[in-house]
């Protein structure tokens, strides 16, 4: 399977026009014979990419005082907890914020407030803040998230996830794609037998089909 994925990535690179920005690499998987109406069968995984994501991951944190200082030092954008209620009343602004960042963190004391006012915005996007205990440096969590991608099907048979960027080499991209493939198939009753199709592509390039071996 690794060779098939590598061949598809190579073809995607060859067929993708040059852009003035760094494109991401994406994988699209379509399932078959899986009852996604049952939440137990849905894919919801955080995959640590062995070669990283190839581009900076945007992280924000609801934090105040000392924890906010630590977060800023780690390159995390800090959101003042006092603005949570206002964001909850401005759904458009909250959605904009949810799109702006890849991951959210929050000091434990603020988790309840976030859940009360913002739950309906980040949760459907799989971006509910991760609680940070007062004794933990947020930099430790942020470092791990820099190489993490979310694989999430919800109730859809087709789902997409990023696994790298055009700036990465073939071996790095292949290793990342294989990490996702291995995790997804391990969660399916029949493994690759539950996958109808798999495609890889750059952000703006054509989708290249990966030959699936059951």
Language model: regions and residue ranges:
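Interdomain regulatory linker/hinge segments that flank or connect interaction modules
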Residues: 7-15
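Long, charge-patterned amphipathic alpha-helical coiled-coil/hairpin "stalk" segments used as oligomerization
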Residues: 82-187
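Flexible glycine-/small-residue-rich
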Residues: 63, 162-165, 202-204, 212-214
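Translation machinery proteins
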Residues: 15-69, 86-94
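Residue-level signature of catalytic and energy-coupling elements of molecular machines
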Residues: 71, 200
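Flexible, glycine/charged-enriched surface loops at secondary-structure junctions
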Residues: 20-24, 187-199
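Solvent-exposed alpha-helices and their adjacent loops that cap or buttress functional pockets
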Residues: 50-54, 95-99, 151-154, 190-193, ...
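OB-fold/S1-family RNA-binding modules
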Residues: 1
């Amino acid at each position: 399977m690794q060779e098939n994925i590598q061949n598809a990535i190579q073809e995607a690179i060859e067929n993708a026009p040059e852009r003035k920005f760094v494109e991401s690499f994406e994988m699209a998987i379509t399932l078959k014979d899986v009852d996604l109406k049952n939440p137990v069968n849905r894919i919801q995984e955080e995959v640590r990419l062995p070669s990283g994501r190839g581009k900076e991951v945007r992280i924000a944190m609801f934090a105040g005082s000392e924890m906010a200082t630590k977060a800023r030092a780690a390159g995390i954008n800090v959101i003042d907890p006092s603005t949570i209620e206002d964001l909850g009343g401005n759904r458009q602004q909250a959605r904009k914020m949810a799109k702006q960042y890849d991951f959210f963190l929050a000091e434990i004391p603020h988790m309840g407030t976030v859940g009360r006012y913002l739950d309906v915005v980040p949760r459907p996007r799989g971006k509910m803040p991760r609680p940070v205990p007062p004794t933990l440096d947020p930099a430790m969590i942020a470092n791990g998230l820099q190489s993490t991608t979310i694989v999430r099907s919800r109730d859809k048979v087709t789902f997409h996830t990023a696994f790298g960027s055009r700036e990465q080499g073939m071996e790095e991209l292949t290793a990342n794609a294989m990490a996702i493939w291995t995790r997804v198939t391990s969660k399916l009753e029949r493994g690759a037998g539950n996958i109808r199709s798999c495609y890889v592509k750059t952000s703006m390039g054509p989708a290249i089909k990966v030959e699936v071996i059951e």
